[in-house]
Amino acid sequence: MRERFDRFLHEKNCMTDLLAKLEAKTGVNRSFIALGVIGLVALYLVFGYGASLLCNLIGFGYPAYISMKAIESPNKDDDTQWLTYWVVYGVFSIAEFFSDLFLSWLPFYYMLKCGFLLWCMAPSPANGAEMLYRRIIRPIFLRHESQVDSVVKDVKDKAKETADAISKEVKKATVNLLGDVKKST
C-alpha cells in the first residue's frame, strides 16, 4: 500500500509537481507532506465551517475534471469508469437528500462521506463505484428498466403535448396581438 502511495505521489501531474517543489524547499519527504495535507483536510471535514462544501468539491471537482479529460481521450475505458462514478454519485446524492437532515448531525459525517466518494473514484478497476454499480444499482435497474422506460416515454409524450399546446396558444396570441395593433393604427 505504501509503495502504491509513493508511486502515486511521483506520477507526473500538477499536484505532484507542487509536492516536489514543497519537498525541495522544505527538505520534508513528499509522503509526509501529502499525509499532513490529508490529515488537515480530514480534521477540517470533522470540525471546519463549510465542511459540506469542501466534501462536495472533492466529490465533484476532481471527477468532473477527469471526466472531461476522459471524454477528450481516444480511450473509451475511462469513459465507462467515470460514467459509472456519476451514476453512483447521482444515486448517492438522491439518497443523501432524503437523509441529510439526520446524517449531517453525525460527527465525522463529512469525513465519512468524503472517504466514501474517494473510494468510489479510486483509480482501480474494482473501485467503490464499480462495485456498487455492479452489485446493487445495475440489478435494480435491469429489473425495472421496462417500467422506467414506459414512464419516461409517457412523461416525454406529455411534455411534447404541453409544449405543442403552449406553442399553439403563443402563436394565436401573437396573431391576435398583431391584429389589435394593426386595427389601432
Swiss-Prot record:
Subcellular location: Endoplasmic reticulum membrane; Sarcoplasmic reticulum membrane
Any one of the GO BP annotations: endoplasmic reticulum membrane organization
Disruption phenotype: RNAi-mediated knockdown in the heart of P10 neonatal mice causes lethal cardiac dysfunction at 4 weeks. Myocardium is disorganized with greater fibrotic regions with significant collagen deposition in the ventricular myocardium. Mice show significant myocardial dilatation and cardiac contractile dysfunction. Also, sarcomere organization is disordered and the sarcoplasmic reticulum membrane forms vacuoles. Myocardium has elevated expression levels of ER stress marker Hspa5/Grp78, cleaved Casp12, Rtn4, Atl3 and Ckap4.
Keyword Cell division: no
CC terms in the record's Gene Ontology section: endoplasmic reticulum; endoplasmic reticulum tubular network; junctional sarcoplasmic reticulum membrane; sarcoplasmic reticulum membrane
Subcellular location, principal: endoplasmic reticulum
Region listing for Required for dimerization and maintaining endoplasmic reticulum morphology, in residue ranges: 110-181
InterPro entries per UniProt: TB2_DP1_HVA22 (IPR004345)
Mode of membrane association: Multi-pass membrane protein
Topology feature Cytoplasmic, residues: 1-30, 71-80, 120-185
Keywords linked to the UniProt accession: Endoplasmic reticulum, Membrane, Sarcoplasmic reticulum, Transmembrane, Transmembrane helix
Tissues with expression: Highly expressed in heart including ventricles (at protein level). Expressed in cardiomyocytes (at protein level). Also, expressed in skeletal muscle and kidney and to a lesser extend in brain, liver and intestine (at protein level).
Pfam families, per database record: TB2_DP1_HVA22
Membrane-side (Lumenal) residue stretches: 48-49, 100-101
Residues annotated as transmembrane: 31-47, 50-70, 81-99, 102-119
Domain notes: The short lumenal loops between transmembrane domains 1 and 2 and between transmembrane domains 3 and 4 may impart a wedge-like configuration, thus deforming membranes.
Family membership noted in the UniProt record: Belongs to the DP1 family.
Subunit structure as annotated in this protein's UniProt entry: Monomer (heart including ventricles). Homodimer (atria, kidney, intestine); maybe disulfide-linked. Homotrimer (heart, ventricle, skeletal muscle, liver). Interacts with ATL1. Interacts with ATL2. Interacts with ATL3. Interacts with CKAP4. Interacts with RTN4 (isoforms A and B). Interacts with ZFYVE27.
Protein name (database record): Receptor expression-enhancing protein 5
Gene: Reep5
